[in-house]
Curated annotation (Swiss-Prot):
Gene3D superfamilies: Amino acid/polyamine transporter I. The keyword Glycoprotein applies. Its main location: membrane. The gene is TMEM104. It comes from the Eukaryota. This is Transmembrane protein 104.
Length: 496
């Protein structure tokens, strides 16, 4: 996310891209959704989930349109550079050469589509992978670019804090209990406090912090180096994730089918909407990774339809996961990390399955943590980078990795309330990335495209929400969400 134009990579079919996008969106946020559903009530949760899914789809089409406009501008600049080079090389050309060049220059002054020969690619074809940072540099002024990177950095800090808390929290829940020897995990009516004993004199919070320290020592050093997620590791973690989700849904359905469901969720409870909103926004987050995902798709003819199909499938999956959870488990017994509800012997008889589900977040999150950390570090470098300048070795190799790693670890040290961490990250930084940035990107790219190519040029990847009303509506919704969440937090604190 350093904001550069990067290699497109190996091409894949549109349906493979659909699967990749599904895997990208459905992540850690899905594991915190059941508790948020139970807290806010099933009807309010369903309505908000569908509406936020629709809003995420709208801004996803905005980003795709901006990607196409960025590709067209890059092609136009390459044509201009080529013309300048040809002008320099032909300064001593004959009169006939001059005549040919004059004709070419007159053609260059027409809109770009008029100089496209038959069979040449559409100027708005998405072939160059232009990351969001580069699009911000193309369409925003300096203040806008800095605000973009600030928003991305805050979101990535929240991401790392969630990851840093989720792994030790899962390990603590699996290995600790009130008595210290209960291998079946959390019982239905058991409420644990951080001060309860874990092993001998060690409290649960002590075990959590020990696991956090081990997690930081093992994965923190990767922040100081370059690391990327390999194809095979991605396949392995995706396979583990879908096995875990499938097992949880099936187990919950079996209990409900056998009339063992304990959940009686309310219809609506507006006190839980704040966290639900943040969790849902976080769970639909994909806009910042769309360039890496969409560009390698070989055929983009029906791209918008495929993206819409993906969102429908994701909505159905989130609904199935959350509704089976809230009707299978009592609302007060649902854990921040849904997998931990299956650590009970009366839910899962096989110890291997209990430990797999309990430790599943540990494996998947541990593979993502170094990637997110390196991405955040690179964004810090890009934010402070000056043209032609280089960083001293200490700043480049020590300062930037340190300011990347320390804050999220400190947040995780202070709290392991995953629902609140996900809610706040989604409600603030998530709102900026998912709503504000795409809306401003598409607004400025449309204006620049009209100036550069004329009114008659059509962007083949233009969003179906092409009226300016939708840009204003998205920004108004983002502002309303910011006010609502902030007011809700303030009112909640004053009641304590």
């Amino acid at each position: 996310m350093a904001g550069e134009i990067t290699e497109t990579g190996e091409l894949y079919s549109s349906y493979v891209g659909l699967v990749y996008m599904f895997n990208l969106i459905v992540g850690t946020g899905a594991l915190t959704m059941p508790k948020a559903f139970a807290t806010a009530g099933w009807l309010v949760s369903l309505v908000l989930l569908v509406f936020l899914g629709f809003m995420s789809f709208v801004t996803t089409t905005f980003v795709i349109e901006a990607m196409a406009a960025a590709n067209a501008q890059l092609r136009w600049k390459r044509m201009e550079n080529l013309k300048e080079e040809e002008d320099d090389d032909s300064s001593t050309a004959s009169d006939s050469d001059v005549l040919i060049r004059d004709n070419y220059e007159r053609a260059e002054k027409r809109p770009i589509l008029s100089v496209q020969r038959r069979g040449s690619p559409n100027p708005f074809e998405i072939t160059d992978r232009v990351e969001m940072g580069q699009m911000a540099s193309m369409f925003f002024n300096k203040v806008g670019v800095n605000l973009f990177y600030f928003c991305i950095i805050v979101y990535l800090y929240g991401d790392l804090a969630i990851y840093a808390a989720a792994v030790p929290f899962s390990l603590m829940q699996v290995t600790c209990s009130a008595t210290g020897n209960d291998s079946c995990g959390v019982e239905a009516d058991t409420k644990y406090n951080d001060t309860d004993r874990c092993w001998g004199p060690l409290r649960r919070v002590d075990a959590y912090r020990i696991y956090l320290a081990i997690f930081t020592l093992l994965l923190g050093p990767f922040t100081f180096f370059d690391v990327q997620k390999t194809k095979y590791l991605q396949i392995l973690t995706s396979l583990m994730r879908w096995i875990a989700f499938a097992v949880m849904i099936v187990l919950a359905l079996v209990r409900i089918g056998h009339r063992q469901g304990e959940g009686h969720p309310p219809l609506a409870d507006f006190s839980g909407v704040r966290n639900l909103f943040g969790v849902c926004v976080y769970s639909f987050m994909c806009q910042h990774s769309l360039p890496s995902l969409i560009t390698p798709v070989s055929s983009k003819r029906h791209l918008t339809r495929l993206v819409f199909l993906d969102y429908v499938l994701i909505l159905a999956f989130y609904g199935l996961l959350s509704f089976t959870a809230i009707f299978c488990f009592r609302g007060d017994s649902l854990m921040d990390m849904y997998t931990l509800n299956f650590a009970r012997c009366d839910i899962v008889g096989l110890a291997a399955v209990r430990f797999f589900l309990g430790l599943f977040p540990v494996f998947t999150i541990s593979t993502n943590f170094p990637i997110i950390a390196v991405t955040l570090r690179n964004n810090w470098k890009t934010l402070f980078h000056r043209e032609g300048g280089t960083y001293p070795w200490v700043v480049d190799r020590v300062v930037f990795p340190t300011i990347t790693l320390v804050p999220p670890v400190l947040v995780a040290f202070c709290t392991h309330d995953l629902e609140s961490l996900v809610g706040i990250t989604g409600a603030y930084a998530g709102t900026g990335i998912q709503y504000v940035i795409p809306a401003f990107l598409v607004y400025h790219c449309r204006r620049d495209t009209q100036l550069a190519f004329g009114c008659g040029v059509g962007n083949k990847h233009r969003s179906p929400f092409r009226h300016t009303f939708w840009v204003g509506f998205v920004l108004l919704w983002a502002f309303s969400c910011f006010i609502f969440v902030t007011a809700n937090i303030v009112l909640s604190e004053t009641k304590l």
